[in-house]
Amino acid sequence: NITFDGAGNITVADPIATGSGTLTKTGSGTLTLSAANTYTGATTISAGVAAISNNTSLGTTDAATTIASGAALNVSGGVTVAEAITINGTGVSSNGAIRSTSGDNTFSGLITLGAHSEIQSDDDTLTLNVSSGNAITGTYNLKFDGSGDTTVDDPIATSSGTFTKAGSGTLLLEGTNTFTGNT
């Protein structure tokens, strides 16, 4: 298991290959992961920001990633993240628990809402495209924000939560959505 902690910024440019070990990000700083990582354990972003720019920066898809309330996953560079992810909250400074900062980025794993949450696209296009099933599930409020565009190709299957679109970017919903809360 490996933990990155502290208020400063840490950049890891070499691959992390801890086998079945976990990766945990704590502390208010930013952890930048740019390599193709091969660890198979879970990834937990407990505080601060984890910034990724490689399809497998979060390791293999064997275990999921969890983003805690007040933490964020920033994605850039035109990557496709196949990892299943649970998001909890609106991220750092309410800029999204998942934040696409640059490039056309794609999430192809299920996103589960563990709490009221926000997804933000700052630039270019963020696409949520799961090969089968729902793109987003959960029973909490969901907000899409930002000046970049977001496309959700598969169903949003949230219940009882409020669905909100904010920011100047375009939100395109292409799935047969089953959310039942207010819009």
What is the role of each PLM region?
Residues N1-T183:
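Beta-strand-rich extracellular passenger or scaffold domains
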